[in-house]
Structure formats: structure tokens, C-alpha cells
Amino acid sequence: MSKGHSLQDPYLNTLRKEKVGVSIYLVNGIKLQGTIESFDQFVILLKNTVSQMVYKHAISTVVPVRPIRLPSASESEQGDAEPGNA
């Protein structure tokens, strides 16, 4: 994982795993709502009544419907560690 994704990936992953509803605002002002189904380096799959592939370069802001707690660096390192290597 590159340094540019050190906050983005855990944030999106927490929203995905906890199925938190989000409002995604695009750079052209359009507001999309749903839950994050999946994401990669370039896109987010947003599910509402249908699934939409939203390109990250078109996103201005991601707003969750409730506050979320991101795992601390030590928690995420423990979660990423392989058994026997911790």
C-alpha cells in the first residue's frame, strides 16, 4: 500500500465492513447515496437500489451518516500481521 492510501483505505474499508451509509459528493455537485460495496485504487462500488461504479477522481467528499472509529495504527498492524510473525 502506498503512502497516499494510508488513511483512505482504512477509512473506506471501515465504512464498507460496518455497512455505514454514505453520501458521496462529486466534483460537479451531484450527490450520491448508498453503502460502499467494494473499492480499489481507482473506483468505489456504491450500492443503493443498484450498484454504481464511481471513479475516485470524480469524488469531492465522502460523508458517512454516522461517526466512525478508525482503527489505530497498532490495531491495524496487529490485524495485518501473519500468525507467528507478530
UniProtKB/Swiss-Prot annotation:
Transmembrane segments: none annotated. GO terms for molecular function: RNA binding. Pfam families: Hfq. One of its GO terms (biological process) is regulation of RNA stability. Homohexamer. HAMAP family: Hfq (MF_00436). RNA chaperone that binds small regulatory RNA (sRNAs) and mRNAs to facilitate mRNA translational regulation in response to envelope stress, environmental stress and changes in metabolite concentrations. Also binds with high specificity to tRNAs. Belongs to the Hfq family. This is RNA-binding protein Hfq. The lineage of its organism: Bacteria, Pseudomonadati, Pseudomonadota, Gammaproteobacteria, Pseudomonadales.
